[in-house]
Amino acid sequence: MSNVTSSKATPSSGKAPEQAKVENIRGVFSTQEIRRVGTGTTTRKTVQKTFWFIDQQPDGSIESQPLNANYVPTGAKRKISMEDLINKFAPEPEFYLNSVYPKMQELQRTIESGDEHREKGETFAAEYEYTTALKVDEDNVRANFGIGLTYLQRGESDKAEDIFQRLVKLDAAFEQEHKHLFNDFGISLRKNKMLKQAVEYYGRALELTENDENLHMNMARALMEIKDYEQCTQHLIKGLELNPEHEPTLRFLSWLQQKSLVPADQQDAVSALLKAYAPQETQTATDGQADG
């Protein structure tokens, strides 16, 4: 497997061969930085080599991620240009094939094994697999979510708190590709009555993605459980500003109004929104609504 690959379709009887197809770039590259160490006559030059996992996305953008000491990509991803890739990065196909790719595959299998055990309720086996994965990549988002959900499944709030503190510092935890795990973790925090953490969790997500009505809805749920009705209502209003036809938010807001939980200074705004957008037979129950 090379860093840049191209392939031609094999000609078959009566068919012309397809044009050469260049696949997206995916592999390991390196950069070198020359540093001067010492002063005066003792000055010497050293070359520092850094390895990066490069992954070109379907839209053509290129993401780079550093490798850790265990030869797996870890930490924050950053975008680079094709010009920078060509001018500043050197391909390392043998290192990728012989060292990095096998480690990435092994890590993937370990996490998948942890997921399988967790889904079966085998929490101690799941914990072992996730712990093994985190020894290889302590910032792995899936492994951190997995072990956090495992602790919450067992009701071990103290251990879950440690994982929570790690997750809220990882920007990657709030990316679209981890949305399902993100939602599961938020729900589990609330079910385990870790409400302060749930509010901080959704607040961190909103710092990175403000324009998501589902996030505002989930934040409102957590705020309602700690009886902060003013902020709860405010997030529901913000959610409707983003999507006036979001039915779960309309139902939630209608329920708050019927229970006389909407603060006085927000009642006019809520009444106007419900009059404008809520269906005539608005459901009043918030229980059982799926988190987005």
What are these regions (language model features)?
Residues 2-132, 136, 159-162:
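Long, contiguous interaction/recruitment modules in multidomain scaffold/adaptor proteins
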Residues 121-128, 154-166, 192-204, 226-238, ...:
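Structural signature of tandem alpha-helical TPR/SEL1-like repeats
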Residues 142-221, 225:
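Alpha-helical adaptor scaffolds
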Residues 136, 170-174, 208, 242, ...:
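Structural marker of alpha-solenoid helical repeat scaffolds
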Residues 11-16, 138-156, 236-238:
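Generic detector of contiguous secondary-structure segments
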